[in-house]
A protein has these predicted regions:
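Short secondary-structure boundary/capping segments
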Residues: 20, 42, 67, 124-125, ...
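Structural recognition of alpha->loop->beta junctions
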Residues: 26-27, 96-102, 126, 208-216, ...
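A contiguous loop/helix-start segment that scaffolds small-molecule binding in enzyme catalytic cores
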Residues: 2, 71-75, 131, 139, ...
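Predominant activation on well-ordered alpha-helical scaffold segments within soluble catalytic domains
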Residues: 20, 37, 41, 66, ...
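A generic local structural motif
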Residues: 14-18, 38, 62-63, 120-121, ...
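Class I S-adenosyl-L-methionine
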Residues: 1-109, 114
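Class I SAM-dependent methyltransferase SAM-binding "motif I" and its flanking Rossmann-like core
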Residues: 84-155, 198-201
């Protein structure tokens, strides 16, 4: 069996229990070497074959998978965070499907969750934002025009941006053009949950200068929105006057 496993955002102990078990049982592990914490490879058994996909093409990755499957081996394709976000797993799965090779997907903790933990923040605050936009700036991989930063910014929802650290000046321009104020709270979270994690609070207008000052050029998430401010409405969920399926509200 081939299993796509989410390694989590960085810290070794943030891989899921299932992911940890699959890693321990694997005969072959192909890991995203540029992003996955190498400490996780200590879980692999002694004779496990380990491949760093940072140095491989899609065809080379598939060749290892196909041969391993033919030899009856358990294979783990270890991706950073949760593979469903910017993990390039669809093209691998489609090729395996064509070859009628079975595979499964083991979800992981995404780095955008790790960033929230680093910020000690909640992305959905009553009266502020109940939606989260996960997106990226267009780079070598284009972004559909209908999904432009400017169009998303018009909603004033919480935004979490992947793969955009090297384009922060342009990002600020697009956010402001879409409707955010330059003073809107923002944050840069470098390597969330890793030992070298760094959190930088700033504003939409100071994203680029903050990253330059802190010498951050990659491996960071950008969070934008008023949820990073201090004012919000209390949640109804635990309000004494609010009735739920499990608790009757009281008059206050």
């Amino acid at each position: 069996m081939i299993t796509f496993v989410g390694a989590g955002p960085g810290a070794e102990d943030l891989i899921t229990v299932r992911g940890q078990r699959l890693l321990k049982e694997a005969d072959i592990v192909i890991y995203a070497g540029s992003l996955v914490n190498p400490g996780l490879l200590k879980l692999c058994k002694e004779k496990c074959e380990i491949y760093n996909s940072a140095k491989m093409t899609l065809e080379e990755v598939l060749e290892v998978m196909v041969k391993g499957h033919g030899d009856g081996k358990e294979i783990v394709r270890l991706h950073t965070g949760d593979p469903c976000l910017y993990g390039a797993i669809r093209e691998q799965m489609d090729e395996l499907k064509k070859l009628e090779i079975p595979y499964e997907d083991c979800p992981g903790v995404s780095s955008f969750c790790g960033a929230a933990a680093a910020l000690k923040a909640e992305y959905t605050l009553p009266g502020i934002s109940q939606s989260v936009v996960i997106t990226r700036m267009a780079g070598r991989t284009p972004v559909p025009e209908k999904e432009s930063i400017r169009s998303f910014a018009a909603h004033q929802a919480t935004m979490v941006l992947f793969l955009s650290t090297g384009m922060l000046e342009k990002l600020s321009e697009e956010l402001v053009a879409g409707g955010y104020q330059e003073e809107t709270p923002a944050a840069i979270v470098y390597k969330a949950t890793w030992p070298e994690e760094k959190v930088m609070h700033c504003t939409v207008g100071t994203l680029a200068e903050t990253a330059e000052r802190e010498k951050v050029t990659k491996t960071a998430l950008i969070v934008v929105g008023n949820v990073l401010n201090t004012e919000y409405e209390r949640s109804k969920l635990y309000d004494p006057a609010f009735t739920t399926e499990f608790r009757k509200g009281k008059e206050v």
